[in-house]
A protein has these predicted regions:
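Short glycine/serine/threonine-biased micro-segments
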Residues: 41-44, 71, 108, 138
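Glycine/charged-rich beta-loop-alpha catalytic/anionic-binding loops adjacent to active sites
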Residues: 59-67, 148-155
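C-terminal substrate-binding/catalytic lobe of Rossmann-fold NAD(P)-dependent oxidoreductases
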Residues: 1-11, 24, 89-192
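Short, surface-exposed loop/turn motifs that are enriched in glycine and acidic residues
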Residues: 66-74, 101-108
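N-terminal Rossmann-like NAD(P) cofactor-binding module of classical short-chain dehydrogenase/reductase
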Residues: 17-18
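Rossmann-fold NAD(P)-binding glycine/threonine-rich loop
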Residues: 24-31, 35-36, 43-66, 72-84
Length: 192
């Protein structure tokens, strides 16, 4: 069965933890996972630098799948970015436009920041701008625009509903079972 809890009871047998809570709760849950040597998928966003550093440090002890977005479509978008180095350069302008529901707390979203970091890892020094909009009940939309000389390329990922995140999280949790310590991403799942 599946148990949903803010704390992990000491007597509960746990194979893997999936966390989509808040940065503070995620760090508490991560500490419990580390203490009990349980793999964890962290889907929470909005972490501070010191929290990200702690996640990185604890990944030396336990397997951590850090996934600000668990959808397959964003994994595809990141893969396209990774394979675009023959077409683009740091001289191009990259623009990310995102739309999320009005209740979303972090802005820009973890997904937008993840896309930005992906671009900068391929094109160090590139100019990457982000516009964030929060309105209505939109589960998430990210549009990447790449400006060339007198032309623009746009790639859009639109979540039709939130079930895609649950499906990706389940896939990630199953994949994480049996993995050794390390900091993993959704890219690792789709490349294995």
């Amino acid at each position: 069965g599946i148990t949903i809890s803010e704390k992990i009871p000491d007597d509960l047998k746990v194979d893997v933890i999936v966390d989509f809570s808040s940065p503070k709760n995620a760090m508490d849950i991560l500490e419990s996972a580390n203490k009990r040597e349980i793999p964890i998928l962290i889907g929470t966003t909005g972490f501070l630098e010191d929290q990200l550093s702690k996640i990185n440090t604890l990944s030396k002890n336990i397997p951590i799948l850090f996934a600000p977005n668990t959808s397959q479509g964003i994994a595809v978008l990141k893969s396209l970015i990774n394979s675009s180095d023959q077409f683009f350069s740091a001289d191009n302008h990259f623009h990310i436009e995102e739309i999320h529901h009005s209740e979303k707390k972090d802005s820009p979203s973890g997904t937008a920041l993840e896309l930005k970091n992906e671009i900068l890892s391929i094109f160090p020094g590139a100019k990457v701008s982000i516009d964030s909009l929060r309105e209505g009940i939109n589960p998430g939309e990210h549009k990447l625009s790449i400006s060339l000389d007198n032309e623009t390329i746009e790639l859009t990922h639109r979540a039709e509903n939130r079930s895609i995140f649950a499906k990706g999280a389940l896939k990630g949790a199953v994949w994480l079972l049996g993995k050794g310590p390390g900091l993993y991403s959704m890219k690792d799942i789709y490349s294995s």
